[in-house]
Regions:
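Beta-strand-centric surfaces of beta-sandwich/beta-rich domains
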Residues: 1-28, 38-136
Length: 136
């Protein structure tokens, strides 16, 4: 399991097609999801989305943007990564005429062997067999 941190500060008056963007490189087999912090003050005026190449990962509906105000939560994705190491792009725009706004993101990845419950159960069974001296 690994966590990768990214921020995107979106300058005021940044309206599409003039958007801000940043990238984050992550490693793993499964992008479990991400924690997000949208600080107070956004008032729904700043917007962001997460993409892998041309594929939009969040929000799930293509062409949509996420926004909010004072949000701290985890967004599950459970996305099987097409490459073990890849780069995500975070894009944003800001309708606010007075302030820049920043979104804070922590991406959580896992290796496939740890993401599968059956692997964990096999490890537990193997450990129990070892503890109790059972062979096979």
């Amino acid at each position: 399991m690994a966590d990768y941190f990214a921020t995107l500060t979106i300058p005021k008056n940044t309206i599409p097609p003039n958007i801000s963007s940043t990238t984050v490189t992550i490693e793993g087999d499964i992008l479990v999801g991400f924690y997000r912090l949208i600080p107070p003050g956004w008032a729904g005026l700043a917007h962001y989305r997460i993409k892998y190449g041309l594929e939009q990962l969040h929000p799930a509906n293509e062409g949509a943007w996420d926004t909010g105000d004072n949000i701290r939560d985890f967004v599950p994705l459970n996305w099987k990564m097409p490459e073990h190491k890849l780069t995500l792009t975070i894009e944003g725009y800001n309708e606010d005429t007075s302030y820049d706004h920043t979104v804070y993101l922590w991406f959580r990845t896992e290796e496939l062997e740890y993401a599968r419950p059956t692997t964990l159960l096999k490890e537990i069974l193997s450990l129990l067999k070892e503890i109790f001296g059972v062979e096979g």
